[in-house]
Amino acid sequence: MDNSSVCPPNATVCEGDSCVVPESNFNAILNTVMSTVLTILLAMVMFSMGCNVEVHKFLGHIKRPWGIFVGFLCQFGIMPLTGFILSVASGILPVQAVVVLIMGCCPGGTGSNILAYWIDGDMDLSVSMTTCSTLLALGMMPLCLFVYTKMWVDSGTIVIPYDSIGISLVALVIPVSFGMFVNHKWPQKAKIILKIGSITGVILIVLIAVIGGILYQSAWIIEPKLWIIGTIFPIAGYSLGFFLARLAGQPWYRCRTVALETGMQNTQLCSTIVQLSFSPEDLNLVFTFPLIYTVFQLVFAAVILGIYVTYRKCYGKNDAEFLEKTDNEMDSRPSFDETNKGFQPDEK
């Protein structure tokens, strides 16, 4: 009998009508390629973020760390706790809760630095908070995950991939450190790298969505609970960050800065950690959450920007600045012409 007429060309064992066809490894290859590309692009984004850090100003905030300390409490206190409360209250699956917590433990994103400039925030504080949260995430993310996932780990329903998370965070810190060095030695080149990195960050999000849509097609059947968490989480971060900063006696412009740094997470990092840490079966359940958070953190950031612009127009620029001077800290507020120039237009 001619087996070639009934067996596929790639069959390995044929006997009559019975054939053994090897499983397609296309998804496995694509998954490996995606993980590698995401890691490289994320390293480029974080390298560019480091190029936005001026070492002497960063050290200045370290010497007067009250603003950074408030930001630290927001970043690694409020956000993980909020993620835990939302996860327990909504009753989502343990693996989904872990991803929500990873998002809550992620450091601030570079987008907050741009928005801080647009809302007349403290640019030096914004960049310093982003840098500090990125460096501290190396220890704080595993610690927060250990504390908040204990109820699921002890019950045996989930295993936290600390090794993958640790490798991702180490790979994150090294490019930031190199970027800081480049900005210290070659500030003009660092400014160009920063702009390239901003574009790379957008490409990274699009790439995650497109390739992820191919690999994890069932992930796009999104539970309403994840939509609800993805909506509430960023607005809770913005609001709680603002009120905690105000409660700590920070001036209005720093309150706006802390609010943005708290609510705007590094979603590219979260997506990369999730991609590297979970099995394809788990990714089908959780892959879309970082994208949901990305959408709503940008939506609410745009709302905040719109409210602030309206406020400035209603009060007038001079009146608005006068109101902020009542904080008695305007004399110490850095001038935008003298602060971080990464987001300034090139001089002609």
Swiss-Prot record:
Glycans are attached at N3, N10. GO terms for biological process: response to bacterium. GO terms for molecular function: bile acid:sodium symporter activity. Monomer and homodimer. Residues 1-28, 109-126, 179-195, 246-284 are extracellular. Keywords: Glycoprotein, Ion transport, Lipid transport, Membrane, Phosphoprotein, Sodium, Sodium transport, Symport, Transmembrane, Transmembrane helix, Transport. The chain crosses the membrane at residues 29-49, 88-108, 127-147, 158-178, 196-216, 225-245, 285-305. This is Ileal sodium/bile acid cotransporter. The gene is Slc10a2. It is a multi-pass membrane protein. Plays a critical role in the sodium-dependent reabsorption of bile acids from the lumen of the small intestine. Transports various bile acids, unconjugated or conjugated, such as cholate and taurocholate. Also responsible for bile acid transport in the renal proximal tubules, a salvage mechanism that helps conserve bile acids. Works collaboratively with the Na(+)-taurocholate cotransporting polypeptide (NTCP), the organic solute transporter (OST), and the bile salt export pump (BSEP), to ensure efficacious biological recycling of bile acids during enterohepatic circulation. It comes from the Eukaryota. Changing I40T: In strain: NZB/BlNJ and C57BL/6. It is found in: Membrane. Residues 328-348 are annotated as: Disordered. GO terms for cellular component: apical plasma membrane; microvillus; proteasome complex. InterPro entries: BilAc:Na_symport/Acr3, Bilac:Na_transpt, Na+/solute_symporter_sf. It comes from Mus musculus.
